[in-house]
Every structure is written in C-alpha cells, then in structure tokens.
C-alpha cells in the first residue's frame, strides 16, 4: 500500500511541474496502478521470470518465461505475452504462448485454455495467480478441457506416447505433420 501512496505522490508532483511549464505527464489509469502494485508484489517460483521487452515504461505489455522443473515439460522454456487492459482487474489479461508447444491446453496459434483467463476471472485475482495457473498447466496438463484435441486424446489414451511426442516437439521435431522449434 505504501508503494501506491508513493506512486500517487509522484503523480501529483509531476502534475504540478507540468502546470508550471514542465513536460506533459500521462495520467495512469486505475488498471496501470493496480498492475504496478501486482508486479511489485510478485512472488514467482525460481522457474518463472518476467521481462518488459518495450521497457519499464510499458507495464501493460510484458512477457513471462516458464521453465518447468519436473513433469512432461521438464527443462523446456515457454514464453508467454501478457496484454493488460486499462480496465484491469475488471477484465482478465490477454495471454498468448509465443513458444510453439505440443500441449492439450495450448493450441498451435498460442491460445491458452485456462479457466481463470475466461469465465472464472474475478477482479480479486492478480498477475501472480495467472502465472501460477500457467505454471500448473505444465506440471499437470488437462485433457478434459483441451484446445489441442489431438494432444489431449494422446495424453488421455496413451501417456507414454504423449511423453514421447512432448520430448520430440521440445527437442525440435515433427509430431504428426506439425513441426515444433526447439525449446530446450
């Protein structure tokens, strides 16, 4: 909460300087303020990291890298883009997987099937919750609510073949007719 007061105080100072002939100041939306708070309070596992490809001035667009330390996706690196709306937290962030991955809950275009990004989103949830949800998809892929129906069927019917397909995809190879770039 103290960080929020500091942000507000800094905004007031900048606004006063602007009225005295200083440079114009962009007013932060409530969504930006909440996101700033969420990011400052992140408590990520060591296998997750966050970066700001557009610089720290663009908090509303960032990337999260997840490197699972166990399970089918062990040692792979998966990058997700986050686009956060100015009305956040009343609207869930838009999340896409930049890494092409053989996964029942992520399709080949990078769309992610995670209930808290859709119908189960609530304003009390935060970026930390979303990142943990994504991390959980790699430790416990879900064949019950798939985007990639082929991968889900293999996971459900033949887990050993699923594991082989995941390894083949992560080391850079074909699964069926689809090529997956190396992500290990």
Curated annotation (Swiss-Prot):
GO MF annotations, alphabetized: ATP binding; NEDD8 transferase activity
EC numbers, comma separated: 2.3.2.-
Associated pathway: Protein modification; protein neddylation
Tissue localization of expression: Expressed in shoot, root and floral meristems, and in vascular tissues of leaves.
Alphabetic keyword roster: ATP-binding, Nucleotide-binding, Transferase, Ubl conjugation pathway
Family: Belongs to the ubiquitin-conjugating enzyme family. UBC12 subfamily.
Name by which UniProt lists this protein: NEDD8-conjugating enzyme Ubc12
Gene source species: Arabidopsis thaliana (Mouse-ear cress)
Gene name in the database record: RCE1
């Amino acid at each position: 909460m103290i960080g929020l007061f500091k942000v507000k105080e800094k905004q007031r100072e900048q606004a006063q300087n602007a009225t005295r002939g200083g440079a114009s100041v962009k007013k932060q939306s409530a969504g930006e303020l909440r996101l700033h708070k969420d990011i400052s309070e992140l408590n990520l596992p060591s296998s997750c990291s966050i970066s700001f490809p557009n610089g720290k001035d663009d908090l509303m667009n960032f990337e999260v890298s997840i490197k699972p330390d166990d399970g089918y996706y062990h040692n792979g690196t998966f990058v997700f883009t986050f686009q956060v709306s100015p009305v956040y937290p009343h609207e869930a962030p838009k999340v896409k997987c930049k890494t092409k991955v053989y996964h029942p809950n992520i399709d080949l275009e990078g769309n992610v099937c995670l209930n808290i990004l859709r119908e189960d989103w609530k304003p009390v949830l935060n970026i930390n919750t979303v990142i943990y949800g994504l991390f959980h998809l790699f430790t416990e892929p879900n064949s019950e609510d798939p985007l990639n129906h082929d991968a889900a069927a293999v996971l459900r019917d033949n887990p050993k073949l699923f594991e082989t397909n995941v390894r083949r995809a992560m080391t850079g190879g074909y699964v069926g007719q689809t090529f997956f770039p190396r992500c290990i």
